[in-house]
Structure formats: C-alpha cells, structure tokens
C-alpha cells in the first residue's frame, strides 16, 4: 500500500511537470528517506492520473501510524506533507530563472501563469481546501458586501496551540515574509516553506 502511494506521488509529479523521467528514481528515494522506509518495490500498476489529496493523505496516515508525526493533527500533517512536496520541487534558482525567461522572452502573463500553475501543482495553493471556502453576498445600505470564510487555512488544533506556547522562541526566520523562509521546514508557530513558492517575490 505505501509503495503504491509513493509511486502515485512520483507519477503525479511527472504529470504536473515537477519530476522528469530521468529524476523518477531520485524523487522516489528522497520520499523513502523522509518516510523512513528502507525497502521498496515498484508497484506493477498505478493510476495514470493520481489524485494529490488522496495520495498525500495515504502517506500522512502511514506516517502517523508509524509515529513520524508528533501529533496526527492538521498542523503537523501540513508540516509533513509540505516537506514531502518540497522533495518534488525545483531549486529556487531554477524557478527564478525560468520565471524571468518567460517574462522577458514570452510575456509577463506567461511568467505569471507558470508561477501560478507551479503554486497549485506543488500544493502551496491547496486547491482541495479552497473549493470548500464559503462565499456569499450580503446586501447592506452601503451596497453589496462580499463575505468569505477561508477554510483553506484551518485553525490550529489545541495540541498545536499548546506546543507553540511551549516552543522555544526563535528569531529565525526574522519574519514570515523574509528571505530566510525559502526552503524552511517550519514549526508549530511558523509555517513551512519546503515547497518554496516565495522564490520570485523574495528575489525581486
């Protein structure tokens, strides 16, 4: 089961253009390392278009069962799956270079489209949560008011809040938008940036 989940994630990476065929074994081995698995056998058959949310949940459930998560809660699951997705990501310099190539040689729109697609494909933008956001329009005497309840950033659970209070205070990264966030693993009181979509904004 876990072998199939790993193979599905690598296949997803290939389909999304995050992993080339030449890097398939390398990506598999990096995932095995994070999952602390030493034995692996390539499944005979996997879906052609694996579902990312389902695949990540399979990996997270397995990691939780084997004690790789401090707590099986949304905060720790998010930290861990961000680490996993970071294994499929190109280096920051590659993202920046390709963005600027598209910007200068094609168009600013092409560069922005590339970056937005990368943000979605890498799970930095969690599509399966955003679609659950609640939106409606409320009429007021000043005009229509657009109201949104953002469910793509769920509230921290009590255990994570307690852990954040007990966590040693750190001045690194200096802030949540500072350059030092690129590739940062995160902690209970600071978000992970392993799937580093802040590359171009930090670089410019």
Residue ranges and their predicted role:
Residues 1-203:
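Active-site microenvironments that recognize anionic phosphate/pyrophosphate groups
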